[in-house]
Amino acid sequence: MKRFVVLQLAAFLVVAGGLSGMLFATDVYQDVQETIVKVLCLSCLKLEPTTEVDFTFTTANQESHPSFILENLTTGPIFLHYSEDVCHGCDIMYPVIKTLFSIEFGKQDSVYEVIPFEDAMISYFYINIDHTTAELRDTLYIYDKDHVQGLPMFTVITLGYDKGVVKPYYTSIYGTLNKDNDQERLAFLTTLLQESIDIYEQNREGYTSG
């Protein structure tokens, strides 16, 4: 009888331990899964969102523009380039952006540079979300205009006039821009930057970063 009770107790402990392990493993799995799917690699999933260049004053999550954005807008338009380590679309766009701005950097670098572009100065930020600060990473959710939650993503911020106030005016585009080759992608981005410069010049006199 005592042996039977001992065996029952041992069996209970094994089952209880197994259930605890399952619960712990499930929590860990959910945490990992949430981290992985938080930002998708668009090309990995064979997704290519339609790229529409429509500027807006409203941030994607209703948060205020970060102070470093407001400050850099005193110099010229801003180009935010979001990437991650494992992302085929990011790899496609990486050399396109380097050609666009005549700049060299590593894929895991953090880059901030004010770059001459035609008759303007562009504040360029390269943000690899796997190797950046929380402040820069969080801007992805501020400017994910179409709520795609995918990479690569490119945000151009200029100045617009809204109800008597000059303030940040931005658009975000995604993936490989629905273009077939690098030449088309480069032409598309060049035109977008030219448009952002024109809008900026129309409104810069009325802007204050404070």
Regions found by a protein language model. Give the residues of each.
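Thiol-based oxidoreductase modules, predominantly thioredoxin-like and allied folds used
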Residues: F55-E63, Y82, G106-L136
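Non-catalytic, surface beta->alpha helical segment in thiol-disulfide oxidoreductase systems
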Residues: D144-G210
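Solvent-exposed loop/turn segments at secondary-structure junctions
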Residues: E84-G89, I129-A134, G160-K163, T176-K179
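Short active-site neighborhood of thiol/selenol oxidoreductases, capturing the structured segment around
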Residues: F68-H88
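Typically the conserved alpha-helix immediately C-terminal to a functionally engaged Cys/Sec
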Residues: G89-V114
